[in-house]
Amino acid sequence: MSPSTLPAPAPGAASGCPPQIRRISPVPRVLRYPANSLVLVAGIPGAGKSTMLNRLFGMTGRESATVRTRAGVRVVDSQQSRNRLHPLLSAVHYPLWRPLMHLLHYLRILAALRRGGPVVVHESGTRGPVRRLLGWYCRRRGVEVHLLLIDSDPGDALRGQIQRGRQVAPRSHRTHVRRWRRLLAACPAGPGAVVPGARSLLLLDRGRAGDLAEIRFTPGPALPAPGGAAAGAVP
């Protein structure tokens, strides 16, 4: 089942989500995208992004570099950057080198895009300038952007942070939640309202993200340009 042929979304509600946000139900087992694509997996910290990517791409969470699968998919998770820097900076309080970790993560995303082929990226999505930069860079490279958003109740996300052993500061958590709600409010205007030039958008709640079995990249024609698609639907 390709993003362009997903069933019509059914109304759904999750905490903090505007009522007009709609989700695909049931969740497709396999998502297919054109080979020259960036799939941006976004959600607040603790939403389950790394958990899903580790499961789908056979990762452990201990990697310290971009993972390239046998199928040629490059998977870029911010935890890889943290793992790479930690041995060098473990004596320094993490908040002091967090900006360096983010910078390394963004540089690795750009490097993966320069190499071509499919790229899957872990990113909170709550930083507007980062979303705009990715949209601009992908347009320059001729790469399609597809959005896979994982929505989570803030309390569940906080518990997810505690479970993984990496908890963001309370103030930072509130900021992520506030920005995420603004992102969700923009979704009904179409994928391009979230990331300029994005071609598709799929919104899953935290629980249903576990139903997804595979993200597959296949040669084929590009999807039509977005034109005000509803959230959860794909043009």
Write out the residue ranges for each language-model feature.
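Glycine-rich phosphate-binding loop used to anchor ATP phosphates in small-molecule kinases
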Residues: 96-145
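Phosphate-binding P-loop
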Residues: 28-36, 112-114
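N-terminal pre-Walker A segment at the start of P-loop NTPase domains
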Residues: 1-30
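Conserved substrate/cofactor phosphate-moiety recognition/catalytic segment
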Residues: 51, 55-115, 156-158
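Hydrophobic anchor at the beta1->P-loop junction of P-loop NTPases
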Residues: 41
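Conserved nucleotide-binding/hydrolysis micro-motifs of P-loop NTPases
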Residues: 80-83, 126, 151-156, 208-210
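Conserved GTP-binding G-domain of TRAFAC-class P-loop NTPases and closely related GTPase folds
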Residues: 38, 47, 59-63, 70, ...
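Conserved phosphate-donor/acceptor-positioning beta-strand/loop module used by diverse small-molecule
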Residues: 141-160
